[in-house]
């Protein structure tokens, strides 16, 4: 098996440099590129489990990219598979906390799926399941994460992880809180319910007060530990963090009919994103890992999410197209050149600015997601309207979704006893796994 694996890797990595012709001004060319890179992404899909072969949150992100593509092109080729996967992963309680993932689940993981469900609702996709609509699935995710708002440290905010025995429980981060903010903004607009605006404002005020979002220049930092009461902010910056807040402000700008407050925040985040996460040639990249070629399998998808959120911004605030679109066009041109690897000649790498736009020998689901999201963002002006219940959406709302299943997690600070048991269980499971591995080896 090891020899077979070696030869498979060798064959896959060998590039014939086929690439594909691409014209950012041609809808036909963009649609063709989307078909190519989506097919490459689906090479990682397992129909039996309805997941991609990656971390579970990336299945949610990948499915969202397919929903975005459906909205942009109207292509229904993969629509049945897309809906089936979104429904299959929702869990018994209709909250994207399935038993298979529950004890590894972070607020960001569950939230990514909530965004995917919200995207499905906004393009009028239906679950075909009477137990919950896509809107209800998004509301359940929102309500459960909101119920974990933790005032025992940092004056509020939600933690990265849900359970105290998971690494990262003592960390509050921008992506978890930014997703909560964006979901509130989207639900406000979709349902025409100002209660969600108030909740979005609550998350925004906390994020800016604690310093995750710096209103001086709209830098969005990764997060902080509760052990310092969030007084020591992590300086790392990731593209999806600024993107998730940007899209939230764009939805609120649109919902409030051009509020100058949300316009100011939207423009600040937009300008920060374009200035920091694009090269001088206007090519999107991840400055925290791409220059050192150290991006992990999660991080390769981050810039694709930023491209998605920039696309939403162009749809919701059309005057931003003149500013944003040239960056998306340059990035898409670079991506087309960089999607020239593998045995098929069209596998995508992640460093699109690298070596005159040739393949960088990297491949994976994240690379494909980023290419899909960047190509579809080119079609933001032609994409289907982001619907609401007042403009033709039919996905039913249930503000109480996720609050009555008896399984909502309420976070309380871990006691010494909790931490002790968590440490013991971690050791015990590790020891059993080690013994099992030794048994398999011999």
UniProtKB/Swiss-Prot annotation:
GO terms for biological process: carbohydrate catabolic process; fungal-type cell wall biogenesis; septum digestion after cytokinesis. The keyword Membrane applies. It catalyses: Random hydrolysis of (1->6)-alpha-D-mannosidic linkages in unbranched (1->6)-mannans. Gene3D superfamilies: 1.50.10.20. It holds the Pfam family Glyco_hydro_76. It comes from the Eukaryota. It comes from Schizosaccharomyces pombe (strain 972 / ATCC 24843) (Fission yeast). One of its GO terms (molecular function) is mannan endo-1,6-alpha-mannosidase activity. It is found in: Endoplasmic reticulum membrane. GO terms for cellular component: endoplasmic reticulum; endoplasmic reticulum membrane; external side of plasma membrane. Its EC number is 3.2.1.101. This is Putative mannan endo-1,6-alpha-mannosidase C1198.07c. Belongs to the glycosyl hydrolase 76 family. Glycans are attached at residues 75, 124, 193, 229, 254, 257, 356.
């Amino acid at each position: 098996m090891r020899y077979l694996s070696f030869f498979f890797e060798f064959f896959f990595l060998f590039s014939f440099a086929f690439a594909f012709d691409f014209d950012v001004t041609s809808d036909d060319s963009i649609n063709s590129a989307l078909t190519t890179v989506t097919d490459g992404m689906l090479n990682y899909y397992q129909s039996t489990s309805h997941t991609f072969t990656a971390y579970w949150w990336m299945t949610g992100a990948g499915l969202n990219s397919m929903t975005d593509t459906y909205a942009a092109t109207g292509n229904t080729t993969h629509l049945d598979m897309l809906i089936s996967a979104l429904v299959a992963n929702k869990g018994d309680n209709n909250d994207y906390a399935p038993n298979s993932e529950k004890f590894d689940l972070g607020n960001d993981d569950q939230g990514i799926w909530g965004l995917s469900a919200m995207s499905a609702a906004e393009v009028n996709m239906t679950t075909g399941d009477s137990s919950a609509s896509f809107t209800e699935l998004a509301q359940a995710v929102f309500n459960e994460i909101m119920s974990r708002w933790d005032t025992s440290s940092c004056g509020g905010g939600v933690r990265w992880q849900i359970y105290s025995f998971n690494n990262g429980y003592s960390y509050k981060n921008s992506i978890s809180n930014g997703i909560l903010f964006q979901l509130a903004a989207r639900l406000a607009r979709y349902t025409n319910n100002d209660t969600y605006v108030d909740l979005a404002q609550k998350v925004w005020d906390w994020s800016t007060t604690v310093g995750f979002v710096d209103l001086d220049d709209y830098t969005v930092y990764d997060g902080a530990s509760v052990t310092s009461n969030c007084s020591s902010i992590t300086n790392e910056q990731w593209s999806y963090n600024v993107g998730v807040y940007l899209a939230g402000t764009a939805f609120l700008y649109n919902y409030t009919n051009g509020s100058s407050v949300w316009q100011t925040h939207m423009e600040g985040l937009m300008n920060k994103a374009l200035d920091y996460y694009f090269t001088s040639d206007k090519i999107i990249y991840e400055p925290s890992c791409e220059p050192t070629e150290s991006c992990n399998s999660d991080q390769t998808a981050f810039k694709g999410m930023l491209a998605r959120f920039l696309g939403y911004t162009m749809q919701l605030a059309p005057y931003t197209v003149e500013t944003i679109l040239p960056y998306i066009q340059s990035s898409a041109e670079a991506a087309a050149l960089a999607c020239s690897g593998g045995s098929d000649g069209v596998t995508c790498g992640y460093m699109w600015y690298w070596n005159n736009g040739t393949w960088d020998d990297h491949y994976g689901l994240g690379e494909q997601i980023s290419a899909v999201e960047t190509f579809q963002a080119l079609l933001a002006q032609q994409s289907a309207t982001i619907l609401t219940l007042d403009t033709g959406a039919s996905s039913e709302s249930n503000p109480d979704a996720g609050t009555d299943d008896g399984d909502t997690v309420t976070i309380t600070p871990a006691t010494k006893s909790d931490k002790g048991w968590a440490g013991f269980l971690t050791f015990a499971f590790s020891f059993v796994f080690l013994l099992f591995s030794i048994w398999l080896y011999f």
